[in-house]
Amino acid sequence: MVKFLKSGKVVVVLSGRFAGKKAVIVRNFDDGTSSRPYGHALVVGLQKEPRKVTKRQSQKKQAKKSTLKTFIKTVNYNHLMPTRYTLDVDFKGVAAEAQENPTKKVEARKECKKLLEEKFKTGKNRWFFTKLRF
């Protein structure tokens, strides 16, 4: 079987607390691990997307609406729906160990937020930063 869920692929989380949210695969485990003996992936996603900004709004309001919130999660392949999009962001601050240690996870989330905000400010990959309508 062809492995098409590679790192950088944009996916939609289908179940759980973040169902319907867009995420990017950071690291994939096709054969599983000893603790999780099934195919899964470490994903970084948008918990809260940036809102629409207009020129009429003040700088303060524009800055507030441009913020985003991220999440880091290990998800079973059955609960991911791949899209045709990719996002080339280097999430080197996110490791598999960040999932187990809560303090490392908080630091990794902050790092991911910073990287995704930089990507958002460039104006590329607009689809990823919009709310999924359903």
Swiss-Prot record:
<dbReference type="GO" id="GO:0003735">
    <property type="term" value="F:structural constituent of ribosome"/>
</dbReference>
<dbReference type="Pfam" id="PF00467">
    <property type="entry name" value="KOW"/>
</dbReference>
<dbReference type="InterPro" id="IPR018262">
    <property type="entry name" value="Ribosomal_eL27_CS"/>
</dbReference>
<dbReference type="GO" id="GO:0006412">
    <property type="term" value="P:translation"/>
</dbReference>
<dbReference type="InterPro" id="IPR008991">
    <property type="entry name" value="Translation_prot_SH3-like_sf"/>
</dbReference>
<keyword id="KW-0687">Ribonucleoprotein</keyword>
<dbReference type="InterPro" id="IPR001141">
    <property type="entry name" value="Ribosomal_eL27"/>
</dbReference>
<dbReference type="GO" id="GO:1990904">
    <property type="term" value="C:ribonucleoprotein complex"/>
</dbReference>
<keyword id="KW-0689">Ribosomal protein</keyword>
<dbReference type="InterPro" id="IPR038655">
    <property type="entry name" value="Ribosomal_eL27_sf"/>
</dbReference>
<dbReference type="Pfam" id="PF01777">
    <property type="entry name" value="Ribosomal_L27e"/>
</dbReference>
<dbReference type="InterPro" id="IPR005824">
    <property type="entry name" value="KOW"/>
</dbReference>
<dbReference type="GO" id="GO:0005840">
    <property type="term" value="C:ribosome"/>
</dbReference>
<dbReference type="InterPro" id="IPR041991">
    <property type="entry name" value="Ribosomal_eL27_KOW"/>
</dbReference>
<feature type="domain" description="KOW">
    <location>
        <begin position="5"/>
        <end position="40"/>
    </location>
</feature>
<protein>
    <recommendedName>
        <fullName>Large ribosomal subunit protein eL27</fullName>
    </recommendedName>
</protein>
<comment type="similarity">
    <text>Belongs to the eukaryotic ribosomal protein eL27 family.</text>
</comment>
